[in-house]
Amino acid sequence: MKSVKKLLLLAFAVCLAVGFSGCLEQPKIEVVGQKIQKVDADNTKIEIQVLVDNPNPIGISIDKISFDIYALVGGDKIYLGHGEQSNIKITSGNTTFTLPVTISNKKLVEVALKEKSTKIPIEIKGDIAVNLFITKVNIPIDIQQEIDVSAIAKEEVLNQLNNLNPNQIQSIAQ
């Protein structure tokens, strides 16, 4: 999870750095939490909590953050998932918002098996639509990084174990 967290933090930091480049100080961005919302046979849905500390007297409106996540395996790009959020208002001071991300479990397992590792090189491509009051600007996102997906698997196994009732535990033990 920390790698995914760092990756999303990096993507958002690039966005805000460009958006606030004319201001006195660059806002500080921090991922303050993440939670696996839902895991099913097909997808894992994660919510990333982002805190922006904007020391500037003015805020900014992000109309939309939208990005796709690809695994980079043997020269190929394999689609893993998508993240998107709209209407984010960054005010002066502290602002917190959530970035929902959906990842394909089938593709994630496929890539991990091909790589023979839980550490997967990925690329995030997308756009950030920023409303600068006078005009709107689309800022491209193109980030390459390695993530460790073992945390997703570990958290889901623990969740499943915690949800077992005594009868299920007894039948497993036999």
From Swiss-Prot:
Annotated localization: Membrane
Gene Ontology biological process terms, A to Z: response to desiccation
Domain of life of the organism encoding this protein: Archaea
Annotated membrane topology: Single-pass membrane protein
First-listed, main subcellular location of the protein, grouped into a coarse class: membrane
Pfam families tied to this protein: LEA_2
Keywords, in A-Z order: Membrane, Transmembrane, Transmembrane helix
GO cellular component, one term: membrane
Transmembrane segments: 7-24
PROSITE patterns in the cross-refs: PROKAR_LIPOPROTEIN
Designated name of the protein: Uncharacterized protein MJ1138
Organism: Methanocaldococcus jannaschii (strain ATCC 43067 / DSM 2661 / JAL-1 / JCM 10045 / NBRC 100440)
